[in-house]
């Protein structure tokens, strides 16, 4: 039986982030998603949730476009390459969810902040909050 926690969107976003990080080091979307979703489960033959696959494959497909959108909101002199891999992937995930899903914008921002707190530090969480909040404000 599937744990309710693994089926929550928050947990699926965490899996999506982990899969995106794996993709930075060379694997395919299916393998990265499967590992992130099943790494602590006994039954690894489960069907992957569509939300997880859609997030990861969408970010991968639009990575260049997302990076351009993120770069437009960085301070002068900053490049996307200057950001950590964690920050880059959290921002990509946040911007993609804001622009491509029916998730309320503030929910997408908050989820990215919470992931930053889990996988980085408070300074990174504040940076992600600022950039995504600016992005949302300018998109409206």
Curated annotation (Swiss-Prot):
Pfam families: NusB. One of its GO terms (biological process) is transcription antitermination. Keywords: RNA-binding, Transcription, Transcription antitermination, Transcription regulation. InterPro entries: NusB-like_sf, NusB_fam, NusB_RsmB_TIM44. One of its GO terms (cellular component) is cytosol. GO terms for molecular function: RNA binding. The keyword RNA-binding applies. The keyword Membrane does not apply. Belongs to the NusB family. HAMAP family: NusB. Involved in transcription antitermination. Required for transcription of ribosomal RNA (rRNA) genes. Binds specifically to the boxA antiterminator sequence of the ribosomal RNA (rrn) operons. This is Transcription antitermination protein NusB. It comes from Streptococcus pneumoniae (strain JJA).
């Amino acid at each position: 039986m599937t744990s309710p926690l693994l089926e929550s969107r928050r947990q699926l976003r965490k899996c999506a982030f982990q899969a995106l990080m794996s993709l930075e080091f060379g694997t395919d979307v299916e393998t990265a998603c499967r590992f992130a979703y099943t790494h602590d489960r006994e039954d690894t033959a489960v069907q992957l949730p569509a939300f997880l696959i859609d997030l990861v494959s969408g970010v991968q497909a639009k990575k260049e476009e997302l990076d351009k959108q993120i770069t437009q909101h960085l301070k002068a002199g900053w490049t996307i390459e200057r950001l950590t891999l964690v920050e880059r992937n959290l921002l990509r995930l946040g911007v993609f969810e804001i622009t491509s899903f029916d998730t309320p914008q503030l929910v997408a921002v908050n989820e990215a902040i919470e992931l930053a707190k889990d996988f980085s530090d408070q300074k990174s969480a504040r940076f992600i909050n600022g950039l995504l909040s600016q992005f949302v404000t300018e998109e409206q």
